[in-house]
């Protein structure tokens, strides 16, 4: 018998013993056949061909195999015996004892006597009958035990991982509860200390009414010694600050970096790194932990309010002889903990220092900072009181003026006055609201902004795409593992091939889920010098392995269904129906967990600086045609070559756009006015600007209808389907979804077939027919995943990107002569990359073209990983090598 038939017979060992499996080539007059004897053994029978009709064709063969199966159940090693019969002679047992045909001796082994009795009842013949029976241990018994061990180990690992995560979270939970229950003095160790002179001073300051609470009609308002007390307060606080000056480094004039929806901004210091909240700042590792109450607003904005219990502000000049347009800094202290903090206030539009006090802080000693234009020594008591009374109310989070072009910046700031209050002076320091603006510091990059935003999202309870995929796969794996064992038990009891095949399919699903989880973990590993792109394509390899596993198992099921079409067995339709119904419900739950929607591997969605808004207009780019840039003085060009977007004031060639207006509408009006003066504006086309009297080079396509993004030199239409709410779909999650969908359809078919068998038991052929149909359906459902995975591995153009339209858009940029060697591929799902050569007119416009092309690819086509090389007509020979010509064959070069 071929080895494949033998292996398959052991794989289907739950079949009835009389199920015929295969033949062995005849050897003379002897024929050998092998039969499955259940989960423990198989029986190979060798008999004489001459007695085939007289013995083996009768129904006694089934009885012989049934009796031999009982012997096989107790057999753990191979046993062979020969039964012979000659006329009226008795049958000799394998142990050498004789068994008379009329009856059985009490000492004879029951199994052997039963087999001998059936042989003795065979038709009397004159020749000798040789029947060799060999009981072999099941080949798959060891593999079945191994598979049980593997499944048990996986379940144990999953249980241990959940238990370990729960145990790791217990100390944090208990410590947080304990820290809330313990007094503040005991948290820091030691007994409660008596209040110092500093805290006594703060408590006295709390008793003094706020300058805003005074009314002009109060007769005693002018006689209260507020100014003198404020001076004494200032002197005391200066002494306290002098003692702690070593612990608070002075801030430099470096710009701070901020990220969308981040509650803290960072400012580089001369000695360390100071992390500043919108209203307070402290040096990491120096100041003790402050006690700040955080409360979540009930509105949609979800802005966190950070309130200090008691603060006392004292002025401190941190720039010394720096230019006057520097941010004012305050030393703030907590009356109960003597913690020193720093509060930064931004300059106003004129370059001066605004005098402001946080309205949400507790009433405290409010001292205005020293101003170069108005020395403090010249202020009298009335002037000081007037200045204190004129303190404006400061919002909890000031909006970033330059971030007005970013929709995420205006989230939570609906007050027009608040938007008009703040602008950036010459110092270029970011401040106020640190949520909703892209990084403006020279060392900040878009990647760091995205990483900080992902950290913020994790802290706020938001899940990233990978975390969401991992959670779904873990839940689906648990459901799949539990129900797989249910179907295995029910399939053995009901003798249903459809249930067993569905259980096998669930086993493949479980393996696919585990492979997908492993691929997700590997894809998060960062790149190294040997793997510069990282391990993103491990996700693709995992999806391919999962698809191949489905194909192999489906082929086995089709093979088994073919045999059941020939000889349908008896099936318990009732048990099969209820098990299939339960499986349908379980698969419905799994498909709900893994529910995804696909937009193709290249149809990634645009996001605003890691935020939840779509891309908004750029405002800080200058037109190269109207105002050529100087190559040596263009930080925007250097940033563009480094892969950055040039929309912040540090990168922008000019700061006029940053200061043009107080809100987004005013900024647009001012920009329109400048466009009218310089002759720009009017009607613009895709990929570049066009004058008022000039038509676009080609009309907008139908797919270009949607929101627009305009700048001084680039006008691109953003597709409406680039909605930030739709994240790109993970390929492993889609593969798992197809697994679960195939199981759901197969369970529905099994339920229908079981209902028919339950109604008409003689319709047992519906079981293999159902298996055959839905196995083929599962094969076809995997073709889409296979196609996209091969497209990524072969570095094909992503499905959602039109390379020809992209090349035309690049050609329409001002100063571009030719575009060749354009390559667009995907590192993994949702990670497209681009590389191309752009031939420009001259060196003067090279940097401008590079910047525009980078922004065009990143904003319209959502290709964030771009490599654009600018060439000149004189260097065209370097791009005419054999490798370049081979790559450019599939696409013709477009010329102006």
Curated annotation (Swiss-Prot):
Compositionally biased tracts (Low complexity): 210-225, 255-266
Organism domain of life: Eukaryota
Compositional bias per record (Basic and acidic residues), positions renumbered to this chain: 82-91, 303-322, 656-680
Keywords carried by this UniProt record: Cytoplasmic vesicle, Ion transport, Membrane, Transmembrane, Transmembrane helix, Transport, Vacuole, Zinc, Zinc transport
Effect of disrupting the coding gene: Conditional knockdown results in reduced growth rates in the presence of extracellular Zn(2+).
Transmembrane segments: 473-493, 503-523, 540-560, 574-594, 738-758, 763-783
Keyword Transmembrane: yes
GO cellular component, one term: cytoplasmic vesicle membrane
Cytoplasmic side: 1-472, 524-539, 595-737, 784-896
Membrane topology: Multi-pass membrane protein
Positions in the Vacuolar compartment: 494-502, 561-573, 759-762
InterPro entries the UniProt entry points to: Cation_efflux (IPR002524), Cation_efflux_TMD_sf (IPR027469), CDF/SLC30A (IPR050681)
Keyword Phosphoprotein: no
Function: Vacuolar zinc transporter that is probably involved in the transfer of zinc ions from the cytosol to the vacuole for intracellular storage. Plays an essential role in extracellular zinc tolerance.
Family: Belongs to the cation diffusion facilitator (CDF) transporter (TC 2.A.4) family. SLC30A subfamily.
Protein's recorded name: Vacuolar zinc transporter TgZnT
Organism: Toxoplasma gondii (strain ATCC 50853 / GT1)
């Amino acid at each position: 018998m071929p080895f494949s038939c033998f292996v398959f017979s052991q794989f289907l060992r739950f079949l009835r013993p009389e199920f015929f499996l295969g033949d062995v080539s005849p050897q003379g007059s002897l024929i050998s056949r092998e039969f499955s004897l259940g989960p423990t053994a198989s029986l190979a029978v060798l008999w004489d061909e001459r007695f085939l009709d007289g013995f083996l064709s009768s129904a006694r063969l089934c009885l012989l195999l049934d009796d031999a199966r009982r012997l096989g159940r107790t057999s753990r090693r191979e046993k062979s015996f020969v039964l012979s019969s000659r006329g009226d002679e008795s049958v000799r047992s394998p142990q050498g004892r004789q068994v008379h045909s009329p009856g059985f001796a009490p000492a004879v082994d029951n199994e052997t006597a039963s087999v001998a009795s059936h042989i003795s009842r065979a038709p009397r013949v004159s020749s000798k009958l040789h029947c060799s029976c060999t009981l072999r241990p099941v080949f798959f018994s060891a593999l079945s035990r191994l598979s049980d061990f593997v499944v048990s180990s996986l379940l144990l690992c999953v249980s241990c991982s959940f238990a370990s995560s729960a145990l790791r979270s217990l100390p944090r939970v208990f410590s947080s509860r304990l820290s809330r229950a313990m007094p503040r003095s005991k948290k820091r160790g030691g007994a409660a200390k008596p209040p110092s002179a500093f805290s006594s001073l703060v408590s006295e300051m709390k008793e003094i009414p706020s300058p805003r609470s005074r009314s002009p009609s109060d007769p005693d308002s002018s006689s209260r010694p507020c100014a003198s007390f404020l001076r004494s307060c200032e002197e005391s606080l200066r002494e306290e600050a002098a003692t702690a000056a070593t612990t608070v480094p002075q801030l430099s004039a470096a710009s701070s970096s901020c990220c969308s929806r981040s509650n803290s901004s960072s400012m580089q210091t001369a000695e360390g790194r100071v992390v500043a909240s919108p209203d307070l700042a402290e040096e990491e590792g120096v100041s003790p932990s402050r006690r700040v109450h955080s409360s979540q607003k009930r509105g949609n904005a979800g802005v966190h309010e950070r309130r200090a219990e008691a603060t006392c502000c004292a002025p401190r000049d941190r720039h010394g002889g720096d230019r006057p347009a520097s941010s004012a800094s305050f030393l703030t202290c907590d009356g109960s903990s003597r913690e020193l903090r720093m509060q930064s206030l931004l300059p106003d539009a004129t370059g001066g220092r605004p005098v402001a006090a946080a309205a949400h802080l507790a009433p405290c000693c409010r001292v205005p900072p020293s101003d170069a234009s108005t020395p403090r020594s010249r202020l009298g008591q009335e002037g000081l009181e007037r200045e204190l009374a004129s303190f404006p109310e400061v919002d909890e989070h000031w909006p970033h003026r330059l971030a007005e072009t970013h929709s995420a910046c205006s989230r939570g700031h609906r007050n027009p006055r608040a938007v008009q209050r703040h602008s950036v002076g010459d110092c270029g320091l970011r401040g106020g609201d640190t949520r909703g603006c892209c990084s403006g510091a020279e060392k900040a990059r878009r990647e760091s902004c995205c990483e900080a935003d992902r950290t913020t999202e994790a802290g706020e309870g938001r899940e990233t795409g990978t975390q969401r995929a991992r959670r779904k796969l873990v839940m689906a794996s648990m459901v799949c593992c539990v129900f797989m064992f249910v179907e295995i038990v029910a399939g053995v009891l009901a003798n249903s091939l459809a249930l067993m095949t569905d259980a096998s399919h669930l086993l493949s699903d479980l393996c696919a889920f585990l492979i997908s989880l492993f691929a997700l973990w590997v894809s998060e590993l960062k790149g190294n010098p040997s793997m510069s792109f990282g391990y993103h394509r491990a996700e693709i390899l995992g999806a391919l392995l999962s698809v191949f596993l489905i194909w192999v198992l489906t082929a086995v099921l089709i093979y088994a269904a073919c045999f059941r079409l020939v000889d349908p067995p008896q099936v318990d339709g009732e048990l099969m129906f209820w098990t299939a119904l339960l499986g349908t419900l379980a698969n419905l739950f799994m498909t709900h967990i893994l529910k995804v929607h696909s937009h193709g591997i290249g149809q990634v969605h645009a996001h605003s600086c890691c935020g939840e808004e779509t891309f908004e207009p750029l405002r800080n780019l200058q037109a190269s045609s109207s105002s050529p840039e100087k190559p040596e003085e263009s930080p925007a060009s250097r940033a563009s070559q480094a892969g950055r977007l040039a929309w912040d004031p540090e990168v922008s060639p000019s700061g006029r756009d940053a200061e043009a207006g107080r809100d987004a509408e005013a900024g647009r009006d001012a920009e329109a006015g400048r466009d009218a003066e310089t002759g720009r504006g009017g009607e613009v086309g895709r990929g570049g600007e066009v004058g008022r009297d000039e038509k676009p080079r080609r009309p907008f396509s139908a797919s270009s209808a949607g929101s627009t993004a305009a700048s001084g030199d680039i006008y691109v239409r953003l597709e409406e389907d680039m909605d930030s709410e739709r994240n790109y779909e993970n390929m492993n999650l889609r593969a798992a979804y197809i697994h679960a969908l195939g199981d759901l359809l197969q369970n529905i078919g099994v339920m229908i077939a079981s209902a028919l068998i339950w109604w008409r038991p003689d319709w047992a052929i519906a079981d293999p027919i159902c298996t055959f149909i839905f196995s083929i359906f599962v094969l076809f459902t995997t073709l889409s995943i296979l196609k996209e995975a091969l497209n990524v591995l072969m570095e094909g153009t992503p499905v959602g990107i039109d390379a020809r339209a992209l090349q035309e858009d690049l050609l329409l940029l001002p100063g571009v002569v030719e575009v060749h060697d354009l390559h667009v591929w995907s590192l993994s799902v949702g990670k497209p990359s681009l590389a191309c050569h752009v031939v420009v007119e001259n060196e003067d416009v090279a940097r401008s073209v590079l910047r525009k092309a980078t922004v065009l690819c990143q904003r319209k086509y959502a290709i964030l990983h771009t490599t654009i090389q600018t060439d000149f007509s004189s260097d065209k020979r370097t791009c005419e090598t054999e490798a370049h010509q081979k790559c450019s064959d599939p696409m013709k070069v477009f010329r102006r």
